[in-house]
Every structure is written in C-alpha cells, then in structure tokens.
Amino acid sequence: MVAIFKDELHEQLGTWPLGYIPYGGADYGEIEAIARAVGDGGDTVFHDTWTAAADRMMIDGQQAEAKGHLTSARESFLRAACFYGKSFHPLFGKPVDPRVRAGSQKQIAAFERGLALSEPAIARQYIQFEGSSLLAYVIPAQGRADEVRPLLIFNNGYDGTITDLFFASAVAASRRGYHSLIFDGPGQGTSLVEHGLTLRPDWETVIGAVVDFAQTLSNVDPLKIALCGWSLGGYLAPRAASGEHRLAACVADPALSSVADGFRAYVMKLGATRDEAANLGAMPAALMERLAQIVANDRKLTWSVVKRGYWVNGAATLREYLASVERYTMDGRIAEIQCPTLFTLAENDMLAGGTQNFFDALRCPKTLIRFGSNQGAGEHCEMRNRSLVNRRVLDWMDEVLV
C-alpha cells in the first residue's frame, strides 16, 4: 500500500478513518489534506492538524444548524467527533497529556451534538459496573427504533474510541436493521482517560454488566443479544462469551486466544529458551533489558508498548506490562464458548497468527471467514475495506439470529 503520512506511526493511526468513508466518518481528500499538512511534523503537529480540521467541521455544523440544515449539521458534528478522536492518539501515556483529555472531551461533545440531531435523538447512557459507570450509547435500527429487534454489542480493543465503534460497525448494523450498543469498557476511551479504569482480562464480568443493561431496553429481544469485538476485542469478546452465556452469538475480528504468545515468539528469537519465554514477567534481567532497548529504539514499539500498553494495563515497567499480558489467555476456557461464533482472519494481520488454531479448538457452532489483500481487506481489522467485513458479518448474523 502507498503511504499517505510520512511517519510510520502517523500512517498507522491516521489512516483508520479510511475505513469510515462509507459510513460518514471521513472522505479520502480530507485525510490526504491532513497528511500533507502534517508532512514531516511530529506528534504535536499531527494533533494540531487533526484538531484544526475538526474545529472547522464544528463551525460548518453550527452554521448549518443555524440555517435549519439539520442533516448537514449532524453529519458535520459526527465527522468532527471522528477527527477529534484521531488527534490525540500519538499522545497516549501516563501521566495523561492534557491534550488527550481535552481531545476526548471535544470528541464526545461533538458526537453527542450529532447524535442529538438523529431521528430519533440518541442520548448518552451509563452502565453501572463495580461502583463506577461506563459511557454507552444505543444506536437504533434505521427506521425501526421502536421495534423489538436483535442487539449487537460492539467491543473495542486497546486504543479504539467509542466513535471508532460507531463508524466502523454501528452505522452498518443500523442500516441492516440491528440495534447496536457501543460503550467504553475498562481501559478504553473515557473509562481510561477520565476515570483511570484499566484493562482487565476477565471480560465476562464487564459484558455481564453490559448484558444486564441491554436486557432493560424495551426494544431489544433479550434472546438475540450478540457481541462483536475487534482488534484486542478479538480476545475480549470470546473471553466474555466463555463466561456470559446469555450471548446469542460472538464475533472476533481477529480472534486471539493469547495476548502474550506474540511476545513469546519474539523473545525466543532474541535468544530466550522456551522455559524462559513461558512466563514473560519472570524473564532474566539481561533478556528483559535487551527487549527494553529494542522497544526504546523503535518509535512504533515505544508507542504501542510503553505509551499505550503501560497506560492501558496499569503497568509502570516492562516487566509489569509483560506479566499483565500473561493473564489475557483463553487457556482452559475455549470449551466454555457455547454460542455460534464467527472468527475473521485477514492474511497480513500479525495479530491473527493464532486464529486458525483457536478456531480449530472451538466446540461451538463456528465459522471462519478469510480476507485477502486482493480484496483490499488483508490488513488488521480489514480497515481498507470495512464495508466488506460488515457485509460478511451481518450476513452471518442474519442467518444466526433468525
């Protein structure tokens, strides 16, 4: 693929909205213009450029609303939310950069201003969870808001925000007649930025609270509630399904049976024995130091492991982080998944290395859908062709949730 941004991390983070083009999150020309403006600039320039574009969209929305052009206003506000959400990703880390908190707040404000102009208007919800509350929105089926319909719960991964879920999945589901629930779980979005809730492996406890909430909704068929996870959500969703048996279906895009296994293979290439790699948090100091130097000398690894990983997992050191990821495993739980389950596998997705073995171990009704580069869908989460994966997943849902 031809890069749009000059910096590799900016390319990784700044091209996600390409997947949202069919759903109103962006247009190619806007992203290309932002990339040109960022040029050789650093993370501050990246942040400021995305923020300026979002600010312009907010002005467009306000002017359209003042003139009574409510559809244009809604579209502008929602697009602004997407762009605010992209602005602060390179700035992840702890202590929380004030620009991350401000960007998150602007994102939610723009998102809610757009949702308020929906038909019917959509308001924020809160899901009670262990003494705290998780931000959520219920996106109704298009033109069928009051009908009792199946509900799809969309689940983020490491660094996605609630607007990513909206544009990547919920809009498509709404068009196909499904109600959707999008939320910020522990370690995600506002739960992390505003409340400091970190990620946890026992995701069945989180989804249990989400399903409790979903079953209070008068327009939801309580027997047709499904869970769809993408990116790290490809671990979280199957993990939840292994313990929350009220789910009628589960989707993992891609499916992960272990977060640590990817690191395990890497440290063995660095010279670790199989026994040493079996417990990442207990690796010898010399090996840990070598790995730390590799991470420190790689900008993308520094962001994904130190800035994002430490913060999301509540870790202060590489050893603490690696010890924490060991807990994200499906060992002993795969046979507990009972509902029909769909796994995706994109050919160039590095996170999908164990998807086939995970799929083979399932004992529930199961489907595996492969995506290739010849479809423009061979990368992580099929971000260059989200409309294709949405068609395939929703077709499968149509058949499973009959």
Label the predicted regions.
Residues 147-157:
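Short beta-strand element of the alpha/beta-hydrolase
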Residues 197-219:
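Alpha/beta-hydrolase active-site loop
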Residues 219-231:
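Alpha/beta-hydrolase fold nucleophile elbow
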Residues 242-323, 345:
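Hydrolase active-site cap/lid region
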Residues 337, 343-345:
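Short beta-strand/loop motif that positions the catalytic acidic residue
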Residues 362-378:
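Catalytic histidine neighborhood in serine/cysteine hydrolases
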Residues 372, 379-402:
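Catalytic active-site module of serine/aspartate enzymes centered on a nucleophile-bearing elbow/loop
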